[in-house]
Amino acid sequence: MRAGPRRQHLLPPQDNRAAVGYQRQDPVIPPQRDLDDRETLVSEHEHKEKTCQSAALFNVVNSIIGSGIIDFSLILLIKGGALSGTDTYQSLVNKTFGFPGYILLSVLQFLYPFIAMISYNIIAGDTLSKVFQRIPGVDPENVFIGRHFIIGLSTVTFTLPLSLYRNIAKLGKVSLISTGLTTLILGIVMARAISLGPHIPKTEDAWVFAKPNAIQAVGVMSFAFICHHNSFLVYSSLEEPTVAKWSRLIHMSIVISVFICIFFATCGYLTFTGFTQGDLFENYCRNDDLVTFGRFCYGVTVILTYPMECFVTREVIANVFFGGNLSSVFHIVVTVMVITVATLVSLLIDCLGIVLELNGVLCATPLIFIIPSACYLKLSEEPRTHSDKIMSYVMLPIGAAVMVFGFVMAITNPQDCTHGQEMFYCFPDNFSLTNTSESHIQQTTQLSILNISIFQ
């Protein structure tokens, strides 16, 4: 392979490659730039460490659950890469819409995983602090079990070392562990829906479907279900990647993820209805030992998901500012800088709901609905009546509407947050509550039944 000239600062990828020495047989998507995802994340001496299909499956499932359920959109993305002869999301958009599209996509592709890293830190700090508070003899006000210390400690001991890997294939086993812990969490949430749900007062109109804030919910779901930003990374880590193999992998990943996400959301809402918080574990009582174990599993899960997002942010920075080629020193420097900034921001923000909404409508929605559809519509020579084009014509305006209206509603009608507060139904003593909401709902509930015995 020939060595291409080094790109200048902020220039998009061109049709050349660095002499890295990495090759694979029969590529479905030809090489397009100096140092692409395969070369950055799977170096020459690591060529034999390509992931098998099962490891890639767990990487995709982990990305979806932690952080796309949009099956068609994911396959459309890889098809667009095949049509354009590109092998990264950025190079696909650059080939389709030129430099302006490349810059816009780079900003979105950086912001989404970066904000996701912030949200994962918030979850880890909130969740694990409650776990350590349950240790006998530990003062709840102890600074060493506070969310700030836990965020810093988990960053230094776990997320930073894992994020320093150059090969995304090495995260396959980590993603398997994360997926297994997610299954345990699902079991705990289901158990508490049965044992705790009947004792939680239901809010009025709890079962009214598609209220006006449904648009905000779509934004949150977009945040949760996206893995488009790292799809090419996982695709490139496959042995002998093909569109057919990718389609099978995505179908299987989506089935697993849909099952877990639907059951998790349904059981959580069945338990708490209108009291449900952005972080579901904020709803459970601190003296619930079973949920405490679930919190521990949940905290570990988001910590293990964190590196997947860091890989993408680092790759975007490498492409835009360093021509795609990060030396060992700059690899460490960029990783440390990104994680440091994300950690500092997460220390200042403690409400998860608004983070999920804004990241969903502003970043995830374009990455899922708008950009893949627009690229495919411009590149494909299929007739307009082709099924792929029809779906693309449907997805594009839906994504634009969700983005605009979701942002307006997230700003004008932000989600309430009760971070760090014990919910009213957690008090073990007899308790009479009259709750008046904005819609003048009044509920009076005797909560004497909610004593410690419920949580044993």
Curated annotation (Swiss-Prot):
Residues 1-25 are annotated as: Disordered. Its main location: membrane. GO terms for cellular component: membrane. One of its GO terms (biological process) is sodium ion transport. InterPro entries: AA_transpt_TM. The chain crosses the membrane at residues 58-78, 98-118, 143-163, 171-191, 206-226, 252-272, 291-313, 329-349, 351-371, 390-410. Putative sodium-dependent amino acid/proton antiporter. This is Putative sodium-coupled neutral amino acid transporter 11. It comes from Macaca fascicularis (Crab-eating macaque). The lineage of its organism: Eukaryota, Metazoa, Chordata, Craniata, Vertebrata. The gene is SLC38A11.
